[in-house]
Amino acid sequence: MQNNNAIEFDKVNFSYGRERVLHDVSFSINKGEKIAIVGETGAGKSTIAKLILRFYLPNEGDVNFYGESSRQVSQKWARKNIAYVPQESFLFRGSIKNNLIYSNPEGINLEQELQEIGVLDWFERYENGLDQEVGERGANVSAGERQFIALLRAVLAKREIIVFDEATANLDIESENSILDATDTLLAYQTSIVIAHRLETIINAEKIMVMHDGKLVGFDNHKNLLKDNEIYQELFSAWNLVN
C-alpha cells in the first residue's frame, strides 16, 4: 500500500435498503491531509465515514486505501490502521490512564505525551489525576469529560487514519480547543477526517468537503468555498447565526 492517496472514493453510490444516500461521490485524500466534512443532516456525511471505516462496502463504485480496494482490504487491517471516535463514546471500567493507553499499551509514555501536547494539566481537575477511576462506561465523569478522554485515546493510538464523527459536539469550548490543539500536534503525520459542527474545526481544516443531498458539491479550502460555493455560504451563514 504505497499509493500517496490514503483514501479515494471512485464514483461511489450507496443505499440503505431502497434509500439512496450517496450519489456518484468521487474524491481523494492524500496521506497526512486534514479534512472536514460539512452538510445538513442527512447529507451523507456519516455514511462517508462508515464507508471509510469499512463498516459497509459501496453498492457501486469503489473505496480505495493506498490504491487497494476496500473489497480486498481486511477488517483486521481496518481495525489496525483506522481509529474512530463517534459523537457518543464509551470508556472502559478502570482508571483514566488505562483508558488512554488501551489501544497502544506498550508504545507510549503517557505523561510525557500529554505534557508535550499541552493537556496534562487538564487532568488536575480529578483528585487522583490520571489514576482516577471512571466507573462502568464512564459513569463517574461527565459526558463532556468522557468524550474528551475518548478523543485523546483515539489520537494516542496513532493509527494511520482517524475519523471523528461530530466527536466534539458534547465538549465545552475550553475542552474542544484543548483537543483541537492536541490533534494538531499529534496528528501531524496522520490522515484525519472530521465531520464538523463548529466553525473552529472547519476553518482549521486543510480542505473541506461539502455534502448536499448525498452529493459532493464542493471540496476546497475555507477561503475558496466561502467565495465560490453557494451551499457552503449558506451553511456558514447559518453557523454564524447560531454561534
Give the positions of each predicted feature.
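ABC-type nucleotide-binding domain
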Residues: 1-243
